[in-house]
Amino acid sequence: MLNKINKIYKQGGLIFVFKKFLSIAFRESKNNLRAAYFKLSTSENFNFNGRKLNYFRHNFNLAYANERTIEVAIVEDFLKQLPKDARILELGNVLSHYGFNNIKRDVLDKYDPAPHVINEDVVSFNPQLKYDAIFSISTLEHVGWDEDVRDPEKIVVAVTNLTSNCLAPHGVMLVTVPLGYNTYFDEQLSKGSSYFLEKYFFKRISSKNQWKQVDYVDVAGAKFDQPYNNANAMCIGIVHA
């Protein structure tokens, strides 16, 4: 901490340190007030396949202002419907950032150094004990796309491996993938290629971060960061073993 303060002091002197402190204090106060508001107020809701779900709201990564607001809500509802003794795998260490530490699950993430995370590649992960349920929040689009050597087709291998080698008989997998980010994934969808047995789509419809379930034709060609920040359309994919 002292090293950070000393570094800031060298950059701009005592006044700069004071301004930096005020900026951090203001940001933290605003975050705390927003968190309190989330706890004390009732969230609006949206519909997913006839089920009314509350928008998820959280400060981390501005979840209240982007696609996380529906992704986490959909995944939370998915998990609530599972048997209590279900073996669960999360692809990508996401939920732990939003306070879901009480959900017993394994977490597979090739790059996350957290001690509870399995650091293996999703394309080759082959556990002895298979999982009754697998879920992933905005992670698959990065597989093969945001790696040192780009391999767009790796996402296909990942989905195939998860369903063939990780999912138990009668198991179910649910993933959320933003449209407009991984153009290979988008192209495959437009050609009718099916990664998932079931596909559902959401479109962001307002600057207030409201979302609506729509048909694919309504989100085909959706852009990332246009017209709103982050995802403007989402694909919810489901596979039953």
Where are these regions (language model features)?
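Class I SAM-dependent methyltransferase Rossmann-like catalytic core
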Residues: 18-83
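Short, flexible/disordered intra-domain loops and linkers
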Residues: 59-65, 144-156, 184-191
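Conserved class I S-adenosyl-L-methionine
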Residues: 83-95, 147, 173-201
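Adenosine-cofactor binding site in Rossmann-like domains, unifying the SAM/SAH pocket
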Residues: 99-128, 133-136, 154-158
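A conserved beta-strand element that flanks and buttresses the S-adenosyl-L-methionine
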Residues: 135-140, 144
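A short glycine-rich, Lys/Arg-flanked "PGG" loop and its adjoining helix->strand segment in the class I
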Residues: 151-172
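Class I S-adenosyl-L-methionine
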Residues: 191-241
